[in-house]
Swiss-Prot record:
SUPFAM superfamilies tied to this protein: 6-phosphogluconate dehydrogenase C-terminal domain-like (SSF48179), ClpP/crotonase (SSF52096), NAD(P)-binding Rossmann-fold domains (SSF51735)
InterPro entries: 3-OHacyl-CoA_DH_CS, 3-OHacyl-CoA_DH_NAD-bd, 3HC_DH_C, 6-PGluconate_DH-like_C_sf, ClpP/crotonase-like_dom_sf, Enoyl-CoA_hyd/isom_CS, Enoyl-CoA_hydra/iso, NAD(P)-bd_dom_sf
Lineage of producing organism: Eukaryota, Metazoa, Chordata, Craniata, Vertebrata
Disulfide feature: none
Annotated stretches, region: Enoyl-CoA hydratase / isomerase: 2-280
Residues involved in substrate binding: G100
UniProt entry keywords in alphabetical sequence: Fatty acid metabolism, Isomerase, Lipid metabolism, Lyase, Multifunctional enzyme, NAD, Oxidoreductase, Peroxisome, Phosphoprotein
Region 3-hydroxyacyl-CoA dehydrogenase, residue ranges: 281-567
Protein name as it appears in the record: Peroxisomal bifunctional enzyme
Record PANTHER family: 3-HYDROXYACYL-COA DEHYROGENASE (PTHR23309), PEROXISOMAL BIFUNCTIONAL ENZYME (PTHR23309:SF49)
Length: 718
């Protein structure tokens, strides 16, 4: 796990060997300890260089070991011993020096970085803090303000920025290890006291209290309710104390964080994202037995908000794109907006815009040679079928045909083509060039090659891609329905939009359900409800106003839309805004009047509703639908659902996702509360506990990592 060599006659070269990122596993720590002891005790050795195998210095702790007892030497005393050694130690940093890897570099007396290396302390993103002296040494090296920013955000920095900040001593484009070896020889005999960061006094600028107060306010605003960033501020503050006191405080804060549910949720989220990449189809096809095609050219049909974002996402990763619109004016508007988006994106990233990859057309005939087509017109099945028929006629037989539908039947689109096996859904989230999530929808006839290609393309575009089954709404939007429904029922019963939103935002959502709806546009859901026969001229005349299709229905959202209140775009929605397009939501007395009139009309006596009830009804209904989705094989594993909600719907990452949250609350508790609310509202099917939830509780409420076994067992008995 660490190779030892004597080079240049007097330099001990220690190479970490734990692929892929040379993580500091127990075996690696043990090897570092033994090789450092050997180097420091060998009179022939005058200096030490530490590097990593395969162009990577060290990616930090092996977080797979977090769940078990500590094995191998603890990191803090190991690093302290390296720093205290009497021979100069040089870190040769290539690839990454992150987390514990950067803390290892900090105890080296000198740091040489390759110009492509990236450095940082990202522990805060896992719900913890740098606990091997990182919060104590970095402020001593670069000062409190810069250290606070890096540690509380977990941001990685380039080698050039690291040099500017003082995190490294030299940046090289040459062989980093060779440069470090020469540097080490020149350092022999030089005093090391000023290079031992723990021995230095942290520079304290004027107004130190104000700096920490501002940092506290900033992390509270940006990471509402999240423990780790606040603990990082407190740990950096402890760097103003003697090292022995500061490192003790760092350890105390780490112990508190490590045992918290938030750390468990954030670490689960980290692994869930990787688990979702390992997709499996009901047919048995999966990520490791399906070869994707290489996509060099693509087409996007429709240059609305979504289509423009998809074009940008494709072009900025080097794919030639033909963008198609039905009218010249729409095409020209779309062209100008796409070019502007690409130019701004290129300027931000410091690269040239990929405008030469773009072609704009009014004719589907131009798509005859592309590798893949993504249809992104509005949600009209008849229109989409018409387009897919034409694509089937125009495109070469091997072209993949994908739809960006947010919930329509992908198999119905496959029906009208000559290649149903090459039809799949690629559900982007708006704005598509910003949002990370991509639902790849597998129809019953979608081939493993088609799904593998869509998943691979998503990854190439920087998306977090999740393979899901075909049903109305797929995973994300299907689950959203009971969540939204419960929010409107709570309005009926006495809550206000701002009360519900505040409860959800205090839970950790960036936006509550009604602010989110105003942003998305209330007319979108209204159109879907009309098409579903829930409102408008197609409603069954026998249905009472508050019942549809044999179940409870809340017409309040329809009443809001009937007044022309479509959200931010019209300056009025669930909230009022100073002008159309404004984002500053204010409570609207007209909405309160509408609610009071509605309750009076239907004889509803408003009652006091607690934040706990809001959270339970909205989130337990959300998770309950997730259990149904797992039972129906629309999602293959709970991690898929959680990743979709973390990256597509703003579920707070420190809560892990709706399924992980249910497991942390306790499945018995979730079942008991759903039964309670379903008893109170028996005509709301979404509150009836899922058979899978009941089965898991009957089997002792296993941890979420074990659900897959029980789901397979349940499927085998169906």
């Amino acid at each position: 796990m660490a190779r030892y060599e004597l080079v240049k006659r007097s330099v001990a070269l220690i190479t970490l060997t734990n692929p892929p990122v040379n993580a500091l596993s127990s075996a690696v720590r043990h090897a570092i300890s033994k090789t450092m002891e050997r180097a420091l005790s060998d009179p022939k050795v005058t200096a030490v260089v530490i590097c990593g195998e395969n162009g990577r210095f060290c990616g930090g702790a092996d977080i797979r070991e977090f769940a078990g007892p500590l094995r191998g030497p603890p990191l803090v005393p190991l690093l302290d011993a390296i720093e205290a050694g009497e021979k100069p130690v040089v870190a040769a940093i290539e690839g990454v020096a992150l987390g514990g890897g950067f803390e290892l570099a900090l105890v080296c007396h000198y740091r040489i970085a390759h110009y492509k290396a990236r450095l940082g302390l990202p522990e805060v993103t896992l719900g913890i803090l740098p606990a091997a002296g990182g919060t104590q040494r970095l402020p001593r090296l670069i000062g409190i303000p810069a250290a606070l920013e890096l540690i509380t955000t977990g941001r990685h920095v380039s080698a050039q920025e690291a040099l500017k900040l003082g995190m490294v001593d030299q940046v090289t484009e040459q062989n980093t290890c060779e440069v470090a070896l020469e540097f080490a020889l020149k350092a022999v005999g030089k005093p090391l006291s000023s290079r031992r960061l723990s021995m230095l006094t942290t520079p304290c600028p004027p107004g130190l209290d104000g700096i920490f107060e501002a940092a506290t306010m900033q992390v509270q605003k940006k990471a509402r309710g999240v423990m780790a960033p606040l603990a990082c501020v407190q740990a950096v503050r402890a760097a103003t104390l003697p090292y022995s006191e500061g490192i003790k405080r760092e350890g105390e804060l780490m112990a508190t964080l490590f045992s918290s549910g938030q750390a468990q949720a954030l670490q689960y989220s980290f692994f869930a994202q990787r688990t979702a990449e390992k997709w499996t189809l009901p047919s048995g096809a999966q990520w490791n037995n399906s070869k994707p095609r290489e996509i060099q050219s693509a087409a996007v049909i429709g240059l609305g908000t979504m289509g423009r974002g998809i074009v940008v996402s494709l072009a900025r990763v080097g794919i030639s794109v033909i963008a198609v619109e039905s009218e010249k004016k729409l095409l020209e508007t779309g062209r100008q907006m796409v070019i502007g988006m690409l130019e701004r994106d290129a300027k931000r990233r410091g690269v040239s815009a990929s405008l030469n990859l773009l072609k704009f057309s009014l004719s589907l005939q131009d798509l005859k040679d592309v590798d893949l087509v993504i249809e992104a017109v509005f949600e009209d099945m008849a229109l989409k079928k018409q387009i897919f028929r034409e694509l089937s006629r125009v495109c070469r037989p091997a072209t993949l045909l994908c739809s960006n539908t947010s919930g329509l039947d992908v198999d119905a689109l496959a029906d009208v083509t000559d290649r149903p096996q090459l039809v799949a859904g690629m559900h982007f989230f708006s704005p598509a060039h910003v949002m990370k999530l991509l639902e790849v929808v597998c129809g019953p006839r979608s081939s493993k090659e088609a799904i593998a290609t869509a998943m691979s393309l998503g990854k190439r575009m920087g998306k977090v891609s999740v393979a899901v089954g075909n049903c109305p709404g797929f995973v994300g939007n299907r689950m959203l329905m009971p969540y939204l429904e419960q929010a409107t029922f709570l309005l009926e019963e006495g809550a206000t939009p701002q009360q519900i939103d505040k409860a959800l935002e205090d839970f950790g959502f960036a936006m509550g359900v009604f602010r989110m709806s105003d942003l998305a546009g209330l007319d979108v859901g209204w159109r879907v409800r009309k098409e579903s026969g829930l409102t408008g001229p197609d409603v069954d005349p026998k249905d009472p106003p508050r019942r549809r299709q044999g179940r409870k229905y809340c017409p309040i959202p329809d009443m809001v839309c009937q007044q022309g209140r479509f959200g931010q775009k019209t300056g009025r929605g669930w909230y009022m805004y100073d002008k159309p397009g404004d984002t500053n939501a204010k409570p609207d007395p007209l909405i309160q009047n509408l609610l009071e009139t509605y309750r009076s009309r239907y004889g509803i006596q408003p009652r006091k509703i607690t934040d706990q009830e809001i959270i339970e009804r909205c989130l337990f209904a959300l998770a309950n639908e997730g259990f149904r989705i797992l039972k129906d094989k629309i999602a293959g594993q709970p991690e898929d659902i959680d990743v979709i909600y973390l990256f597509g719907y703003g579920f707070p990452r420190h809560r892990g996702g709706p399924m992980f949250y249910a497991s942390m609350v306790g499945l018995e508790r979730v079942l008991e509360r759903l039964e309670y609310y379903h008893h109170a509202l028996p005509d709301v099917p979404h509150l009836e506990p899922s058979p899978l939830l009941k089965k898991l509780v009957a089997r002792g409420s296993p941890p979420i990592q074990k659900w897959r076994e029980h789901i397979k067992s349940m499927h085998s008995h169906l």
